Amino acid sequence: MIYNLLFNYQFPFISSFAMFAAGRNYEQVRNSIGYPHLNVKIGATHAGISVGEDGATHQCLEDLALMREIPGMVVINPSDDVEARAAVHAAYDHVGPVYLRFGRLAVPVINDREDYKFEIGKGIVLREGKDVTI
């Protein structure tokens, strides 16, 4: 189905829990999307360890490592809903595979500045300092 969409000049946005999008489907993502550098976007929800009542079987940290090692795969882990919206638009505009990683729980908004602009591969300086680097 993905190939049918691509050959008709459309591209799929697919979504699943991170545990399944990256874990269970890793070989298919690597071989069928990553290696041929297809224009497919993967939205992975419930990433991390805060998945609520879904429990340990649905917790996923290794998705970052799995997706980052695929050549050409862009991995985006938005920090809040403002960045998540901007990241989806950036993924749409990017030609090639993208893995968008979303948590389950609500998080505080930190990207509410008027000059905020999301760019793939660039970080945001929230506050200058000398004591800690993150």
Residue ranges and their predicted role:
Residues 1:
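Glycine-rich oxoanion-binding loops at beta->alpha junctions
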Residues 4-129, 133:
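Conserved thiamine diphosphate
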